[in-house]
């Protein structure tokens, strides 16, 4: 049987967990084997900029950080389960990538 590998990424961890919970519920309802969600390392993007636009004065800096949370879910590629997963309403800040593997 084929498997589907679902990769989820988002800056909003609550929205990401809601989508993974919906995938879990679909797997339980359809009776399909599932492994995950596996939390992958969080990517931290840091940007440091000078506060002063002209370069005069003391060197003070602003620090900004963006965290990208990722999850990985492997599920059996049952036709019924995959149709239901495709119908999940996904928030704009969550990206989903579905890949079929054998």
Curated annotation (Swiss-Prot):
Transmembrane segments: none annotated. Keywords: Ribonucleoprotein, Ribosomal protein. InterPro entries: Ribosomal_uS10, Ribosomal_uS10_CS, Ribosomal_uS10_dom, Ribosomal_uS10_dom_sf, Ribosomal_uS10_euk/arc. GO terms for cellular component: small ribosomal subunit. GO terms for biological process: translation. One of its GO terms (molecular function) is tRNA binding. Part of the 30S ribosomal subunit. Belongs to the universal ribosomal protein uS10 family. This is Small ribosomal subunit protein uS10. It comes from Thermococcus gammatolerans (strain DSM 15229 / JCM 11827 / EJ3).
């Amino acid at each position: 049987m084929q498997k589907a590998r679902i990769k989820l990424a988002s800056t909003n961890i609550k929205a990401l967990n809601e989508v993974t919970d919906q995938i879990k519920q679909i797997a339980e309802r359809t009776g399909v084997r599932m492994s995950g969600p596996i939390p992958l390392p969080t990517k931290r993007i840091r940007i440091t900029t000078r506060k002063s636009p002209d370069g005069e004065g003391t060197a003070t800096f602003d620090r900004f950080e963006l965290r990208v949370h990722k999850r990985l879910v492997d599920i059996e590629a049952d036709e019924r389960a995959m149709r239901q997963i495709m119908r999940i309403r996904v928030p704009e800040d969550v990206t989903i990538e579905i890949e079929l593997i054998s």
